[in-house]
Structures are given as structure tokens and as C-alpha cells.
């Protein structure tokens, strides 16, 4: 385990996990003195067989916020899911992001913040099937995602990349309008001339301008879905979604796939920390 990761496993079961996870990271010491990225994954998430939690956090103004999210966000999400298992997980993710945003702003000193890209993968019964059905063939895998900022999640489906997140940047027209309506200014594609992202966890000195409310999605995972890429902008600054997927589509090991993407980012001029998580589905 690196100093900047939280890799957690629930008790092993006699059943196989249907997904495989690989992670690679690099401080990029040519341009960065510190590593502010954090990643987390949890097998058998919420003590449920074959559920998964996957997340990357890209810190700024210090590592405090990203480290706090790496240690605590999955616990908040788990508690909220188990408190009411009938709730839409997208609502759970939204509430959990807002809760940890408040925690960071009240419990941590300074103005540290982070972007976040989070996935919850779980088995569900379709609405048309009784909740007490024991027929495993009737269960389906559902993926729920949430993000703030410009960390991104991409699904590779049937040869095509599908972006499951939204880049909350000050250069985005909708986000620019929201910030200005809240009383902020966009200068040189930055909030008040300082911060490039318009949504994050933490950043308490920006108050209502930079918010923790995430973009959320849900999608059924089928046999057409090959893998997920979760990565900070250190990767996406130098490669687009489809090219990233094409680069690793023939690789059979997720750790190797993640390493290939990190290596590509470093060789193609990224100036940021780089963290990549690849989940084979």
C-alpha cells in the first residue's frame, strides 16, 4: 500500500469476484514536488458479495482533503446505503458528497480541496422481480457514479468510450453561469482567478462558489462492457477518452493497463500528478 492509497478488503468468500482492479500512480517529480492524488477501492463493498467501490481523488492546496476522502467517503456511502437500501444510489452519492464536503470544511485546517470520481458497482434485482427472489440469473449488475471537478470515469462498451462524468471547469459555460449567479467571477478560466474547477470537496474559502454537489449517473453493466478507467486530469489533459480506451483494450491485466496509461501521460507532457485505476468488468 502506498502512502496515498486506501485499499480495503472485506472477508474472503468461496465465490469469485467478477471484476479485477489495477492501479498505477506517479508523482511526476519533473513538475511536482508533492503527490496530492489518493485512490481507494473496496472489495465486497458494504459487506455485500461482489460489490465494489472505486475512487480517485485529486488534491489541491495540500493533500488533506484528498486524504480525508480516501479514508472516509466510502464509509459514509456505505452507512447511507445500509440505512435505506431502497433509496436510489445516486441520491445516496449526492448526500454523501455533501456530507464529506461539510466534514472537510469544519474539521480540517486550511483551504485544501480535491476533485473526486467515485463508482459503486453492485448486484440488483430489476423492478419487475420480487425483492425476495433467490434466482441469481435474475440479478443484474448496476454501476453508479458521482464526480466533482475534472477527475473522470470512462466506460469502454462494445468498442466505444462512454464518459460517465462531467468536467466541472471554469471554462464550461453552464458552470461559469452558476458561479457568476452565486456572486463569483471567472477570470482566465478560473474561479475568482484562482481555481480551475468549479466543483470540489473542501475549498471552504470559496464558500458557495465552488460546491460539492456531484454529477451522478447509473448504468446497467452487460457483457458488452469491458472495463472502466478512473483517472485524474493528469491523464485526461493529454489524451481523450476513446484513445485511452484504444491504448489498453488488448491488455489482459488491469495493473498493466493502468501502468500503460500513466506511462503515456508522462511521456506526452502532463505536468500534474497522475493516478489511473482500471477496473476489468
UniProtKB/Swiss-Prot annotation:
The lineage of its organism: Eukaryota, Fungi, Dikarya, Ascomycota, Saccharomycotina. Belongs to the PP2C family. GO terms for biological process: fungal-type cell wall organization or biogenesis; mitochondrion inheritance; negative regulation of MAPK cascade; pheromone-dependent signal transduction involved in conjugation with cellular fusion; signal transduction; tRNA splicing, via endonucleolytic cleavage and ligation. PROSITE patterns: PPM_1, PPM_2. Its cofactor is Mg(2+); Mn(2+). It comes from the Eukaryota. It comes from Saccharomyces cerevisiae (strain ATCC 204508 / S288c). Residues 20-281 form the PPM-type phosphatase domain. The keyword Signal does not apply. Its EC number is 3.1.3.16. Interacts with NBP2 and PBS2. It catalyses: O-phospho-L-seryl-[protein] + H2O = L-seryl-[protein] + phosphate; O-phospho-L-threonyl-[protein] + H2O = L-threonyl-[protein] + phosphate. Present with 1520 molecules/cell in log phase SD medium. Serine and threonine phosphatase. Involved in tRNA splicing and cell separation. It is found in: Peroxisome. Mn(2+) 2 binds at residues 58, 233, 272. GO terms for molecular function: MAP kinase serine/threonine phosphatase activity; metal ion binding; protein serine/threonine phosphatase activity. CDD domains: PP2Cc. Binds 2 magnesium or manganese ions per subunit. Manganese is about 20 times more efficient than magnesium. Also has activity with calcium. This is Protein phosphatase 2C homolog 1. Mn(2+) 1 binds at residues 58-59.
Amino acid at each position: 500500500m502506498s502512502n496515498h492509497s486506501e485499499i480495503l478488503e472485506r472477508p474472503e468468500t468461496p465465490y469469485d469476484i467478477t471484476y479485477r482492479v489495477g492501479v498505477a500512480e506517479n508523482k511526476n517529480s519533473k513538475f511536482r514536488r508533492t503527490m496530492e492524488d489518493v485512490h481507494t477501492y473496496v472489495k465486497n463493498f458494504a459487506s455485500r458479495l461482489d460489490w465494489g467501490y472505486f475512487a480517485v481523488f485529486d488534491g489541491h492546496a495540500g493533500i488533506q482533503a484528498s486524504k480525508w476522502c480516501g479514508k472516509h467517503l466510502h464509509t459514509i456511502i456505505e452507512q447511507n446505503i445500509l440505512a435505506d437500501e431502497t433509496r436510489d444510489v445516486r441520491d445516496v452519492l449526492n448526500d454523501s458528497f455533501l456530507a464529506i464536503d461539510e466534514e472537510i470544511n469544519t474539521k480540517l485546517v486550511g483551504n485544501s480541496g480535491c476533485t473526486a470520481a467515485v463508482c459503486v458497482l453492485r448486484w440488483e434485482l430489476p423492478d419487475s422481480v420480487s425483492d425476495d427472489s433467490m434466482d441469481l440469473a435474475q440479478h443484474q449488475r448496476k454501476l453508479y457514479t458521482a464526480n466533482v471537478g475534472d477527475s473522470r470515469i470512462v466506460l469502454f462498451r462494445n468498442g466505444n468510450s462512454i464518459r460517465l462524468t462531467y468536467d466541472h471547469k471554469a471554462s464550461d459555460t453552464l458552470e461559469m453561469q452558476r458561479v457568476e449567479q452565486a456572486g463569483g467571477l471567472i477570470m482566465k478560466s478560473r474561479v475568482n482567478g484562482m481555481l480551475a474547477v468549479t466543483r470540489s470537496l473542501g475549498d471552504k474559502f470559496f464558500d458557495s462558489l465552488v460546491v460539492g454537489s456531484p454529477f451522478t449517473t447509473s448504468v446497467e453493466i452487460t457483457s458488452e462492457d469491458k472495463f472502466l478507467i478512473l483517472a485524474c486530469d493528469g491523464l485526461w489533459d493529454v489524451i481523450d477518452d476513446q484513445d485511452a480506451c484504444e491504448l489498453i483494450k488488448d491488455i489482459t491485466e488491469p495493473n498493466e493497463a493502468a501502468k500503460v496509461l500513466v506511462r503515456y501521460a508522462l511521456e506526452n507532457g502532463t505536468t500534474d500528478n497522475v493516478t489511473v485505476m482500471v477496473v476489468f468488468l
